[in-house]
């Protein structure tokens, strides 16, 4: 009888360890990484900013996609809940985290599409008169199994 109880306890313990091992396996895989830029465009300048997005930012993003540097990009309009919050989000999706390390390649593509780095920096200063970059965050898609 004691042998049966001990054997039953050993069997139960081994089943628990199998269940614990199964929980060690990730139930997701890591997907694309998206850079989310929060922008606040001053009142009265929204169309001006959209014109810049269409004339410069969009062709640059298309060139990045053609070069294989990004896999997607989007623009979102938000309704701010309070002052100091963004009203535009620029969304750039990379295949993985390694895609974020391609700054030199992105700069070369941007020079071909827009102009030199110095020229781009001067244009940024001009845009900063009517828009403010509130911050950037990176989010990663988790693909559930």
Where in this protein do the model-derived segments appear?
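Sec/Tat signal peptide C-region and signal peptidase I cleavage site
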Residues: 16-22
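Short amphipathic alpha-helical segments
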Residues: 45-72
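An amphipathic, aromatic/His-enriched active-site/gating alpha helix that lines ligand/cofactor pockets
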Residues: 25-28, 63-71, 91-140
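Bacterial N-terminal signal peptides that target proteins for export
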Residues: 1-9
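Short beta-strand/turn micro-motifs at beta-sheet edges
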Residues: 22-27, 77-79
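Short, solvent-exposed loop/turn and secondary-structure capping segments
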Residues: 50, 85-87, 101-105
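Acidic/histidine-rich, surface-exposed loop or edge segments in extracytoplasmic proteins
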Residues: 29-44
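Charged, often glycine-rich, active-site loop that binds/positions anionic groups
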Residues: 79-92
